[in-house]
Amino acid sequence: MNPVPPNQNSNGASAPAAPSSGAAAGPSPTFSPLYQQIKALITQSLQSGEWKPGELIPSEVELAGRFKVSQGTVRKAIDELAAENLVMRKQGKGTFVATHHEERAHFRFLRLMPDEGVPHYPESKFIEVKRLRAPADVARLLDLKSGDSVVYIKRVQSFDGVPTIVEELWLPGLIFKGLTAERLNEYKGPMYGLFESEFGTRMIRAAEKIRAVCAGEDDGALLKVAPGTPLLCSERVSFTYGDKPV
């Protein structure tokens, strides 16, 4: 969970089991719409790590042979996966598993852009990193039991030296068992990239609510604004494969 306080040719047929085509064979879909079942099977392979973030997945022809379906069915499934940012098409190269280490991925959840439209990368300063018991509201959002271990992170993100975001993150302690303040300070890439590469957890989508708030004393001090200053509060829950909140 990532609250930020101050800021679908179904042919109607089933497919038989398919032989391997350059990759480990998996079960074939047994009900329609067919392309949705192919999409689900490809997603299972992504989730299991058969194809890792940044890796090239089999071609549409190979996947069609693997699942005994038409190439058009595979293409439609991949189109949806690309629209959901699970894979990326690269002209002349093929389709790759999406990764948070891609430059464009950095702004998928952090949707801040200056007036001139050129993305700026924030600097982060960690204020607090600790392991504690999940409060009831956090446990509910993360589908945990009240009192389960969570990692709490508070940081300030600045653009061009101006503190802009005070961010609080609550992460399931079991998944992020080895996450420490020292590792966060050492790591220089996007935080979601760290979660992906070192903890095997990829953020797939997010549910977000935004509301207007007034700055409190603590957050105001971190943002260098007076208490009562109007701010935007974004409350976000991120989900990984299987729609599991993380």
Residue locations for each model-derived region?
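Extreme N-terminal segment that seeds HTH/winged-HTH DNA-binding domains in transcriptional regulators
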Residues: 1-69
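C-terminal all-alpha effector/ligand-binding and dimerization domain
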Residues: 6-17, 122-246
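Short, cationic-aromatic polyanion-contact patches
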Residues: 35, 59, 96-110
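N-terminal leader/targeting segments and the immediate start of mature chains
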Residues: 41, 82-83
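Beta-hairpin "wing" of winged helix-turn-helix
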Residues: 50-54, 83-92, 98
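Residues in the helix-turn-helix
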Residues: 73
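Short, hydrophobic-biased segments on the C-terminal half of alpha helices
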Residues: 78-79
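Acidic/proline- and glycine-rich, intrinsically disordered low-complexity segments
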Residues: 112-116, 189-191
